[in-house]
């Protein structure tokens, strides 16, 4: 990371400097002092005793030498442990189905003071207007919401229909925005490796910022070439040796634990005292139900400590300081003089029990955040409007003809993983030779009037009914899986009627549905209401069979061509290892 860019994110006036230094010297009154607290030392391990002194947005000093410092207000930490605010190194807020405003309300009281967002979900639907809205939300947020400029819209050129483009010229207009930290995940890794000029132009344009990667399972010379292009990190690693090799070659490793992709158990054994500055935590995609019931980055820290015996200072280091350094946010990530006062007070550091949160030097009150949510959302001017340009469908739209004795490709799902396997199944007059095979279809929703792309899905666990959604990465067309064409059509028509959303159909009836009026991706409901609705959706989905833990999130990745091995886009069946379209019938 080029630390010469730190000035971009660390705005402090000369007057603020003078006031801060006066308090640091002991010549002026602090705004806040946190007493009766121990500070977890992320650098040396152990703890630092003594108060934390705050002036404005910044920490003026820490330690016993400030015990008698006067302050306008004192906070009794009651013996709590203080750690830096948590940082999510990579996520798509849209995948939480919450607006950035609602997301802040749900996660800031849990200690998540900083997020590095890639809003490419909404940018794929509505282009620069979606990015501009995210920037407006970030500008007014208490939470530090930083943005990586979406690099691959669509994820892979020529493989899917999406709603908008995001040109290099448009991207450059946002490069110097104070909330922008770099270039978001470069998903077209074959294009980068092969030196496609359009992709290298993007990397060159953002080279003085952070360049995010995306290269699941990549190794050998190809991985070397990808890193040689300037890519600095990857959040897609899912195997221990894969993660180790990326670290050896100089990449920073983002350890992901989301609602669908669960890589923490595989990668946590890599973390040690030596490489932890190169390791970070991220969620990528996490829904409101999990946030409400399990947590966010706090849940990942808890698992590192309890399940993987990671030392406290290392677990909290990878959740804050490592990420801050990687993105050049050197005013964040430590509880030290001159750093921004983003502080989490923990009544139990091992269990990550959050007692109180301060951000930019101010205590956070969850009830105040909730009370202000509606007004702040309105102030951001959300991009409302129906983005579903698709007429209702009928069962005949999903008709597939199979020949007995022929072999057909099946997208084989791995529960709680984003990768799939490519398998095959033989058709007979009695059906397929695997009883777990159901149907999948992707319907473009941007007015192109294409016929549905249809395929076969195995391993998902759907024994009856149908699920449909307008959340399908990254182009966010309509994806539907089902056992019958009639129920698939019913589910699709419900999400069309809702202007986007999620739906469960069983026994010929809609059992549960959730409208998502912003870009077919996000709701304007509160986090609690969303969590309750998702709970109802999941309960209805469970009646359809032994589905993945997060069926809609897992289903959303079945159309993402940049993650292997076999996916279905609006253009057809795509081989994510050969990076080429293939046929449903196996003819080789």
Curated annotation (Swiss-Prot):
Keywords: Hydrolase, Manganese. One of its GO terms (molecular function) is adenine deaminase activity. It is an enzyme of class 3 (hydrolase). It comes from the Bacteria. Its cofactor is Mn(2+). It catalyses: adenine + H2O + H(+) = hypoxanthine + NH4(+). The keyword Transmembrane does not apply. Its EC number is 3.5.4.2. GO terms for biological process: adenine catabolic process. Gene3D superfamilies: Metal-dependent hydrolases, Urease, subunit C, domain 1. NCBIfam families: ade, PRK10027.1. Homodimer. HAMAP family: Adenine_deamin (MF_01518). Belongs to the metallo-dependent hydrolases superfamily. Adenine deaminase family. This is Adenine deaminase. It comes from Shigella flexneri. The gene is ade.
